[in-house]
């Protein structure tokens, strides 16, 4: 019999708060974490707002050298991992360091470092570029630094799959547990891409909302007036453990990761396949692996990016897989509050799925004021809803046609 995979700890840093509790409470209240960009002057950019991590002071958590050298996405990962380990009652000093693997997802990596070092190169010449830049912009530096900071010596790697990166990281961690290769995996995702290069590039692409006059209403998944996604940043780390490890440590799991499905569209680098074949298949694979019927899913945390193409395509995917149940299952897009955390989004939304299960509450989709006729399901648009949630499903559909779907189950 294959080992089962349980979540025993969660750590979160994001636009809604500096920890899991504050993030969940803000989500329940329908709070928008989106506002005018403060980390650089956005004047002149087509999009001037984002879902930033507010009041983040790395010196509250890290030493002076780490504050000075580490890219923001690595700092987020370390802080969120610390909360997750504490939540799981895992002390790195007292456990076998080789027993813990690390798999983290990020869509871009150290793009903030890239932007800053490019400015130095342009303004002060090649001798002023940091010799550490080549290290701290790499996607794999985040799991490496988590390993070093906490002394964890199991295998570590980064998953880079655009918007599905951290969902795929959880999926690979799930497979490590199920195969018996590891009993404990620190997994999730981190992203800090709100910098001039990324904001200008995505803006020129036409992917970002330009609702500069009212940023808090800009992320409006499934709304007829949606005009693009809103960039967000942050990290979410989950501690995944085998049933054997959970039993031997005597801890109470939060939820079970029961299924994972992944496919590729093989269609277009930015547009989803309108036929929904591959995205639907990913959902079906996750549901099948969880050994459940589609009708048993109580809540879907939608990818819901607030882009014209994604939202109507995802609605079609849900209808295709769930049939009549699509009209009854609760759906929401928490990106309406956080913006799109890119490579960290899948893990962030997985953490919110687990909170939904623990609290039997569906977080809302805010800003859905003008329903799109092509998006006609229950998106929880009038506030958080209390209802029994035994099984939650999270969709992540990334640029490049990466589809990753996770199924979580209650353990009570």
Question: For the regions a protein language model found, what residue spans apply to each?
Answer:
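Condensing-enzyme catalytic core mediating Claisen C-C bond formation in acyl metabolism
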Residues: 4-8, 31-36, 213-290, 299
